[in-house]
From Swiss-Prot:
The protein's role, per its UniProt record: DNA-dependent RNA polymerase catalyzes the transcription of DNA into RNA using the four ribonucleoside triphosphates as substrates.
GO cellular component: DNA-directed RNA polymerase complex
Organism superkingdom: Bacteria
Family that this chain belongs to: Belongs to the RNA polymerase beta chain family.
Species of the source: Burkholderia ambifaria (strain MC40-6)
Name of the featured protein: DNA-directed RNA polymerase subunit beta
GO MF annotations in UniProt: DNA binding; DNA-directed RNA polymerase activity; ribonucleoside binding
EC nos: 2.7.7.6
Taxonomic lineage from the root: Bacteria, Pseudomonadati, Pseudomonadota, Betaproteobacteria, Burkholderiales
């Protein structure tokens, strides 16, 4: 088995019972693949597939002028490389994007030859089409300097859907069936039955009309309509009665209204008897062709065709007329013998279309189309052209209507056609097929669709959403171009004169900046980033709304299995509408979610893996991943638990066709990180999944001792860690950069064989948490491609580490852990276990005001030198300064308006030239309740404005860092080149050279070492080929130097050019403060099983319960939090964590007594290979075993994968191994070694019962009491009511509401109440009075009229009611 460089350092012991058949796919693949398909940036213009940008262009171009003599054609598009890289965009507040240029061709035809087109002239040109934001390698976008994510949308797939109203519309509870044709874009077409069984249609949810109007509009006559939906009964009229052509099936189940006889007159069915199968057999045996029927059998039937008098050509009766006595009389008079009527019955052949034709008042195609026009455009006169144009535009025009590839495939599948391709507009037979199926449904044949089935909902990813916006922009451009194309020839215009890119840019900008699906990235920790990018939302444009979404849409559907996680979804109004992709889920070409299965043939599981969509899956019998199989892959059990079309059942192995690939297949990333998930209640698992995303990265991340094995995948795929692009040797490492000399076989010829990784140091995330990368390699380490070189936030040796492993005791402790409160030892705080760093960004801008420019300066009047002590000469705070609330960070003054001066002030000013009062101090200060250390300052200056010293210094530092990188690359390049050169030169014969090298001398190593490297190139070689090689190496080094100088100049130019700032802004300063947050009472914490709580008290270490060996617990939790919540997983985690730590202590003890390496190897083999997945420790060298052991001292990390975790028996084995009997006895353990005797820290007495004790991975969540604590003495007041504002952000007061007033009234505390409602709130005069009284030392309250009462009086007056106060 292959272990990567980092995996070898610390192997996670897995308890999985099943081998890995299918690796977890790259977790951000959906986002990255979708966007690369959209751009197709690396594909040459001519070879691009018709999708993404290419599809948008080809759908709008060519644009033809109104007169048809000029057209604009699209040739290809190209994307330029972005001006700034991702980091620069984030610092400068820019969008990371690329300019899109399209090559278009203007073709002008000759007007002189209207018959056949003759090209007069062709102009081709590249036109700028706006900026397209680019995706970062981690699947996000940088928009205006902040990282955003475009969430995928789950929407109803285009196609045709049949449903009924579940009997809710009509009071009788009758099922009303309906059908809806949904295109990708264009008008929706609905068909619906009303309670009277008449079929209507409506377009775009407008007024409904009988469906036969639509059928006539597409060109069918009433006869054709009836022929399409009914079978006919044929009658031959006799002088009395008639002969009916006998069709046995149509008579079954009916009641005979007369005696039915055979040819000889023998009665087979008596009158009023129901016709059954025996009667039909008798009639068939008698070879009956016709049945004689009496006259009244014909009455009430409906004619299927127009009946025309052969002689006169007069229509005697029309199709769909009822047969009456008078009609029969007319028919006999005209000598008509044969007539056809519609065959209907009450059971499975209703007269719906016939009834609808009766309601329909239109007569022909034109009338029908006019009726549709009137419905769509009420009040407009229906001219012939307008009517035709509107009808064709509705469903037949490619510009206005697009069913899309998916829609056509779904439509054809639903109506039972074999081919899945076809035209993208609606065809006449599509409409007919839909109505036929709907009528059949009403007749009781077939099934309605389930709209929550994942075969009927598809995912729209970033690429598709962006393409739709881009197309919308292009369509706006198209309108403008059409107008101008007519003048193209006369005014001699070029393509760039025709195309204005503004509409495209604004459409794209609006989408990425403010669409509901473009969200501010959740960056609290790596897991929250990954989850955000894998999120699937049913909300957003074209989706559902929270208020309208019912219960069914939100519920878990059987087709979610392996596609969408049934656990992870937000609590609250969005529950079930926002979901997360399952671990292995994948999108197919149509946008439907697929999940992988292993193929099973003749009850033998093969290695073939097929991805099935929800529709395909319904056709197969699928076994679960935990079905027992032998070593040959044969299914062993007599009955296997399996699923078919959403139903679970036990079947024999020979019926199984597929099998799940992994037990974790059904859950998302966050849920698969919960160990023992199978023992937790679903609601708590949901909370656990959601709370892991809120874990704040700790100062020193610590891997979970009990994990699930997915931690490494998660950390690596999130992009938080630094991975090696190419293998090689670590050449240099410090805290900020890693330099790797690439292996020869991986380096491309002629390029620098150096990879430099600049680490991210103390950077602010979107949620103000700290992103910091730490190298985990040493100089000289050999690394391969994909190895982890540096840990990021919340990762430890390349594994996700969201919290800390805490020693947890489940016991009550003086009521301090009542109701989920958490008791924590002071040692945890002292060791900085949960200390986190939060980075706050504070901005100040200097604007150009009407009264003059604002100035950033140190020269501020009325400020003491103490307050200015931390500012440099430019007025900006030093890096490293420790600041408190209220301290000045950036000094800034704003010009004040000229005030009217008193004569005395004028005199003083004239004498002293006092000018300082013209400006007011508007410096940037640290907000209330914040303190920290300044870690970075950025200064941005507008083009053409003099840079201050500080800004210049920042630029110089940046250039110095860049030069260092280039020098490193050059050093390695030259080092390699000179090594190659030395190998080549030694032993060669020289024709002369420096240091008097004689002709014909053989060059040796000593001579070269004595010579300066650059003088080697002056050696003249006898061998021409070698001389040429020497020259080539010299040229390549000089070329590299030239390239590096160019790169440096490029960087300098970027840094020294002015910054793009908003209008009116001259200078902007950003100050970054690092705030250290220690754990304190009021902080929210949680485990991974939904067991959340608030820290109630931090207890001195000596008061905590402790074990017999003196080791105190870190955390005390209430045992009552477990049984009612049913998340027993936390208890199992504690047991297994206890074993993991115990094993670590045993390894530590071996290292301390310097045990033999064989003993160590044997012990590790026992741990890793006694049960669960086997590890290949044989391949480790002794040094590697030793390093592994050192890393295991803090606990052997375990992996217990979801639904395939450690059993009770395995946990028992591990506990026995970790705590041999002598240690167990000393600690007072119970026989199963999962409970321990504890002693009270305050009294030293032993607790009555043993306590469950062990290690749990515990997280600190992003709800910190520091962000919530807030107090106000005086502050801002609301303008109208004059009451204090509310909330921390406004520095508001505490609301004393209605109920609180009742409480004081109940106590009769009238003076307290008066004070609360007047001087402490909105009695303006009273407030000032109180202040005056306090200054005088007189503690008296003069309460007046509350301002809000005056507001009330004014409001009453505004209603026209005169209200006055009588003062007495």
């Amino acid at each position: 088995m292959q272990y990567s460089f980092t995996e070898k350092k610390r192997i996670r012991k897995s308890f999985a019972k099943r081998p890995i058949v299918h690796q977890v796919p790259f977790l951000l693949a959906t986002q990255l693949e979708s966007f690369s398909t959209f751009l197709q940036a690396d594909v040459p213009g001519t070879q691009r597939k018709p999708e993404g940008l290419q599809a948008a262009f080809t759908s709008v171009f060519p644009i033809v002028s109104h007169n048809g003599f000029a057209r604009l054609e699209f040739v290809s598009y190209a994307l330029s490389s972005p001006a700034f890289n991702i980091k620069e965009c984030q610092q400068r507040g820019l969008t990371y994007c690329s300019a899109l240029r399209a090559k278009v061709r203007l073709v002008i035809l000759d007007k002189e030859s209207p018959n056949k087109p003759v090209v007069k002239e062709v102009k081709e040109q590249e036109v700028y089409m706006g900026e397209i934001p680019l995706m970062t390698p981690t699947g996000s976008f940088v928009i205006n300097g902040t990282e955003r994510v475009i969430v995928s949308q789950l929407h109803r797939s285009p196609g045709v859907f049949f449903e009924h109203d579940k009997g809710k519309t009509h009071s009788s509870g009758k099922l009303l069936f309906s059908a809806r044709i949904i295109p990708y874009r264009g008008s929706w077409l609905d068909f619906e039955f009303d309670p009277k069984d008449i079929l209507y249609f409506r377009v775009d949810r407008r007024r409904k009309m009988p469906v036969t109007i639509l059928l006539k509009a597409i060109g069918l006559t009433p006869e054709q309509i009836l022929a399409n939906f009914f079978v006919f009964d044929n009658f031959t009229l006799m002088d009395e009665g008639a002969q009916l052509e006998f069709v046995p099936e149509r008579l079954r189940g009916e009641v005979a209204r007369f005696d039915i006889t055979d040819r000889d007159g023998k009665v087979i069915v008596q009158k009023d008897k129901r016709i059954n199968a025996k009667h039909i057999r008798d009639l068939e045996a008698a070879k009956t062709k016709f049945i004689s029927v009496p006259e009244d059998y014909l009455l009430g039937r409906v004619l299927a065709k127009n009946v025309v008098d052969g002689d006169t050509g007069e229509v005697i009766a029309s199709a769909n007329d009822e047969v009456t006595e008078s009609v029969l009389e007319k028919l006999r008079e005209a000598g008509i013998k044969e007539i056809q009527t519609l065959y209907t019955n009450d059971l499975d052949q209703g007269p719906y279309i016939s009834s609808t034709l009766r309601v329909d008042e239109t007569t022909d195609k034109t009338a029908a189309r006019i009726a549709i026009y009137r419905m769509m455009r009420p009040g407009e006169p229906p001219t012939e052209e307008a009517v035709e144009a509107l009808f064709n535009r509705l469903f037949y025009s490619e510009e206005a209507y697009d069913l899309s590839k998916v829609g056509r495939m779904k439509f054809n599948r639903r109506v039972g056609r074999d081919e899945i391709t076809g035209p993208m507009t609606l065809q006449d037979d599509d409409i007919l097929a839909t109505i036929k199926i709907l009528v059949e449904l009403r007749n009781g044949k077939g099934e309605v669709d389930d709209i929550d089935h994942l075969g009927n909902r598809r995912v729209r990813c970033v690429g598709e959403l962006a393409e739709n916006q881009f197309r919308a922009g292009l369509v706006r451009v198209e309108r403008a171009v059409k107008e101008r194309l007519g003048q193209a020839e006369s005014e001699n215009l070029m393509p760039h004169d025709l195309i204005n890119s503004k509409p495209i840019s604004s459409a794209i900008r609006e989408f990425f900046g403010s669409s509901q699906l473009s969200q501010f990235m959740d960056q609290t920790n790596p897991l929250s980033e990954i989850t955000h990018k894998r999120r699937v939302s049913a909300l957003g444009p074209g989706g559902l709304t929270r208020e309208r979404a019912g219960f069914e849409v939100r519920d878990v559907h059987p087709t979610h299995y392996g596609r969408v996680c049934p656990i992870e979804t937000p609590e609250g109004p969005n529950i079930g509408l926002i979901n997360s992709l399952a671990l292995y889920a994948h999108l197919n070409e149509y946008g439907f979610l697929e999940t992988p299965y292993r193929k099973v043939v003749d009850s033998k599981v093969t290695d073939q893996i097929d991805y099935l969509s929800a529709i395909e899956e319904g056709r197969y019998m699928i076994a679960q991943a935990n079905a027992a199989i032998d070593e040959n892959g044969q299914l062993v059990d007599e009955l296997v638990s399996s699923r078919e079309a959403g139903e679970t059942m036990m079947v024999t192995p020979d019926r199984i066709q597929y099998m799940d690939v992994a037990p974790s297949q059904i859950v998302s990333v966050a849920a698969s990180l919960i160990p023992f998930l199978e023992h937790d209640d679903a609601n708590r698992a949901l909370m656990g999944s959601n709370m892991q995303r809120q874990a704040v990265p700790c100062l020193r991340p610590e891997k979970p001792v009990v994990g699930t094995g997915i931690e490494r995948t998660c950390a690596v795929d999130s992009g938080t860690t630094v991975q090696a692009f190419r293998g090689g040797v670590v050449d240099y490492v410090d805290a900020g950069r890693i330099v790797i000399r690439v292996n020869d076989d991986e380096a491309v010829a002629g390029e620098v064989g150096v990879d430099i990784y600049n680490l991210i140091k103390y950077t602010r995330s979107n949620q103000n948490t700290n992103i910091n990368q730490r190298p985990i390699v040493k100089m000289g380490d050999k690394v391969s491609r994909g190895d982890v070189l540096a840990d990021g936030a919340s990762t430890d040796l390349g594994e996700l580490a969201l919290g800390q492993n805490m020693l947890i005791a489940f016991m009550p402790w003086n009521g301090y852990n009542f109701e989920d409160s958490i008791l924590i030892s002071e040692k945890v705080v002292a060791d900085d276990r949960y200390t986190s760093i939060h980075i706050e960004e504070l901005n100040v801008v200097a604007r150009d005001t009407k009264l003059g420019p604002e100035e950033i300066t140190r020269d501020i009047s009325n400020l003491a030198e103490v307050q200015l002590g931390r500012l440099d000469e430019s007025g900006i705070v030093y890096i490293g300064a420790e600041v408190e609330a209220g301290d000045v960070l950036v000094g800034k003054v704003t010009p004040k308006g000229e005030t009217q001066l008193t004569p005395e002030e004028k005199l003083l000013r004239a004498i002293f030239g006092e000018k300082a009062s013209d400006v007011k101090d508007t410096s940037l200060r640290v907000p209330s309740g914040m303190s920290g250390t300044v870690i970075d300052v950025q200064v941005f200056t507008r083009e053409g404005i003099q840079r201050d010293k500080r800004a210049q210094q920042i630029i110089d530092d940046e250039l110095k860092r860049y030069r260092l990188d280039l020098n490193d690359q050059l050093r390695i390049v030259e080092g390699d080149a000179f090594q190659r050169l030395a190998r080549m030169l030694v032993g060669k014969v020289a024709n002369g050279g420096p240091k008097k090298l004689a002709k014909g001398t053989k060059i040796d190593q000593a001579y070269l070492e004595d010579l300066d490297h650059y003088h080697w190139f002056d050696i003249r070689l006898a061998d021409d080929e070698a001389a040429a090689q020497l020259e080539a190496i010299k040229n390549s080094i000089e070329e590299k130097r030239h390239q590096f100088d160019l790169a440096f100049e490029e960087k300098r130019k970027k840094l020294t050019q002015g910054d793009e700032l908003p209008p009116g802004v001259l200078k902007m300063v950003k100050v970054y403060l690092a705030v250290k947050r220690r754990l304190q009472p009021g902080d929210k914490m949680a485990g991974r099983h939904g067991n959340k709580g608030v820290v109630s008290k931090i207890v001195p270490i000596e008061d905590m319960p402790y074990m017999a060996d003196g080791r105190p617990a870190d955390v005390v939790l209430n045992p009552l939090g477990v049984p009612s919540r049913m998340n027993v997983g936390q208890v199992l985690e504690v047991h297994l964590g206890w074993a993991a730590k115990g094993l670590g202590w045993r390894i530590g003890e071996m290292l301390q007594r310097q045990a033999k390496i064989e003993e160590m190897r044997a012990f590790l083999t026992k741990i890793y290979n006694d049960s669960g997945r086997k590890e290949d420790l044989e391949s480790f060298t002794d040094d590697e075993i030793l390093e592994l052991a050192k890393n295991l001292r803090e606990g052997v990390p375990f992996a217990t994968p979801v639904f395939d975790g450690a059993t009770e028996e395995e946990m028992g084995k591990m506990l026995d191994l970790a705590f041999p009997d002598d240690i167990a006895e000393q600690l007072g353990m119970n026989p199963s070694k999962n409970q321990v005797r504890l002693y009270d820290g305050r009294t030293g007495e032993m607790f009555e019962r043993r306590v469950t004790l062990g290690y749990m991975h515990y997280l600190k969540l992003h709800h910190l009491v520091d962000d919530k604590m807030h107090a106000r003495s005086t502050g801002p007041y609301s303008l109208v009511t004059q009451q204090p504002l509310g909330g921390k952000a406004q520095f508001g007061g505490q609301r004393f509401g209605e109920m609180e007033v009742w409480a004081l009234e109940a106590y009769g505390a009238s003076y307290v109440l008066q004070e609360m409602l007047t001087v402490k709130s909105d009695d303006v005069n009273g407030r000032t009075k109180v202040y005056e009284n306090l200054v005088k030392g007189d503690h008296v309250i003069d309460a007046g009229m509350p301002e809000s009462f005056n507001v009330l009086v004014k409001e009453i007056r505004s209603l026209g009611i005169d209200i006055d106060l009588d003062r007495n």
